[in-house]
Structures are given as structure tokens and as C-alpha cells.
Amino acid sequence: MKRQKNWTGLFLGTALVCLALVVGLTVSIDPYMHYRRPQLDKFRYEPKAEAERSINNGMLRHLDYDALLVGTSMMENTKTSLADSLFGCRSIKTVSIGASWWEISSLEALALEHNPELSLVVRGLDMTYFDEAPQALHYEIGPYPTYLYNDNPLDDVYYVLNRDVLYSNCLPMLLDAAEGVTPGLSNLDDYGAWKQEVYGPRAAMRRDAPYADAVQEALSDQRRERVLYNVREKVLSLAEANPDTVFYYFLTPYSAAWWGDLRQAGQLEAQLEMEELVIREILPCGNIRLFSWNTVRELTFDLANYKDRIHYGPWVNDWMLEQMASGEGLLTKDNVEAYLSRERELFETFDYNTLFDQPEPAQYGAPEFFLQ
């Protein structure tokens, strides 16, 4: 019996020592920058796309920056280096693929809370989420690490005793340091950026059947109220509470194939009404610059720019930054009526079946329009 107790004590003692070592290693390296500023003189930090939700919190709290690029996959290919050059800023990028308006707004709020130097925010307003549920959180894209965002220290157990954090982050960073890998933070241009993809009509449309017409449904009162709530609570409230920060927002330019699917589903009218609501709510806000390029045919009607119905190539991200810096595509009280009229005319009258006639791109890369 005594021998059994000794073995039990030895086992428990060993287990506690091992747990303490894991906790100590995670806290000391802190790969997600949860506790402190990154130790850029000791370790190599390389934010990974598969851990976007986990590392964004630490980046926003502990990196040095005065500009923020934030959003979903619509922002993943946006380059901090180009933003720095165009706007004369020092930017970071925090992205979360498929995130809701609530989640992206929470990242903005976190940055504004912890960084009084923040003077510029660039964000894409995903048009698919205009009328989503007010507190929507998209778990289908992966778990949301609440323990990294709340203020409950007891929840940190999910971080400091996390197998993925240990094996995919701490140990590789420790080995890099031992092997003399240059410490620092990897280029955030690459954070979340896609590998080379296949673009063109076949990839964008992913259909063989022709587009059909349908009776269009008007926007319901319930959806209208959701749109107004979302834009007021997740866009305007942040800008109004931070008058010294300038917010560059843009409507994410989806392809004509997406608009064709909307029309076939009878949702084109509702989508146009939602967009108009969003625009008219935002325009009076003095520190928001709202941009849209939905009516630029060389962009939205050329499927060589898209790998699916909504995701555009990295050259589009570059172009949009350049457009924002030069003020092109800015919506104002003087041009909004012409823009809304032009957009409605384009997407209501376009023959979407002509999209099948577009040739496949000869090679990967930006169409000529974006090379001018």
C-alpha cells in the first residue's frame, strides 16, 4: 500500500512539473502576444492564417502602429507596406476570414481602446452581411477563442495548456531561436495572404446552367431594421466615439456572377435597397470616407479578377488602396444619387448569360486595366 502511494505521489508530482514547464514555456514565449509586447530581439513571430482569431488580440494590444487594416478575406491580400507608402503611416493588418460585422467591429474597438495613436482605419464592409443577426459570430469558420479576448485570468488555462500553441508555436519558435533564425516579426503583407489561385469565368461562376430571371422581392421591414442596427452600432458608433480617427471604409466589390445569382434568387432589389440604406446612413459622418467601385466594369464585370463569386485577386487590393489614397471611388452627397442610379441600371439590365462568353485568363495575374 505504501509503495502504491509512493508511485501515485511520484506520478502526480511528475505531472505537475510537466504542466508547470508547459505553462512556463508558453508564458515566457507568448506566441500570441497575449501578455506582453513581442520579444522581437529573441524570437521570430510569424502570424499564421489558421490562427488569425487567436493572434489578432495580441497584435492589436501590443504592437506599435498608428493605422489599422482590418476585415475578412476581402482584406487578407491587402499590403501593409503599400498602405504605409500611400498614407504615410505605420500600419498593421488584423484579418479574420469569414468574420461577422460584429467580430470585425470588435477588433476595431479593441484597437481604439488600446492605441490612442490610431489615426487611420481601413476596412471592407462585406455586403453579404448587411442584414445579419446583430451579435452574429460565425462558428462555421472555426472556434472563437473567447479566453484570449475576455479579462478572466482563469480562462488563460486554455492558452497556457494548449497543445496547438505548444507544438505549432512555442516549440518551433524555440527551435528557430536555437538555430539562429533572425528574430523579429514577419512581413505582415503576407499575413493571411493567399497562395496563387485559379481565376476566371469557370472559377467565378461555378455553374453551367444559364441565369434565369425571377420576380424581385423588396426589402422587408425586419431586414431593414437589422441593416440600420448593424450600420449604426458596428460602424457609426465607433467613428462618432473617435472623431480624431479617420475611417476609410469600402463596399466589398463582388463579381457580376454574384449579382447574377442574386437576381436569379429574386434578391437583387433587396440587396440594392440594403446598400442604399448603408450608404445614406454613413455619408453624414464626417470622419468616415466611404468608397465603392461596384460600377467599375473593368473590375466587377471581368471575371478574370475573381477566384469565386466574391473573392478578387491581390491586384484588386493594391488598386483599391491606391484608389482610396487618391480619393477615387469616394461617395459624397454630390455624387451618391448618380452612383446609386448607375449601379441599379447596371445590375438590373445586364445580360448575365454573356459572362459565359468571357475567355479564361491565359495566365495568372492582373488584367491590363490594373497594370496601367
Regions inferred by a protein language model and the residue ranges of each:
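Membrane-embedded segments
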Residues: 70, 74-156
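Hydrophobic membrane-insertion alpha-helices, especially the h-region
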Residues: 10-28
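Conserved, well-ordered alpha-helix/loop/beta-strand core segments that scaffold catalytic motifs
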Residues: 121, 202-285
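Secreted/periplasmic serine-hydrolase-like ester/acetyl group-modifying domain
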Residues: 124-125, 134, 138-241, 337-372
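Loop/turn elements at helix/coil->beta-strand transitions in domains of secreted/extracellular proteins
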Residues: 64-66, 89, 116-120, 242-247, ...
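Short extracytoplasmic
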Residues: 45-69
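C-terminal regions of proteins
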Residues: 276-372
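Alpha-helical transmembrane signal-anchor/signal-peptide segments
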Residues: 29-52
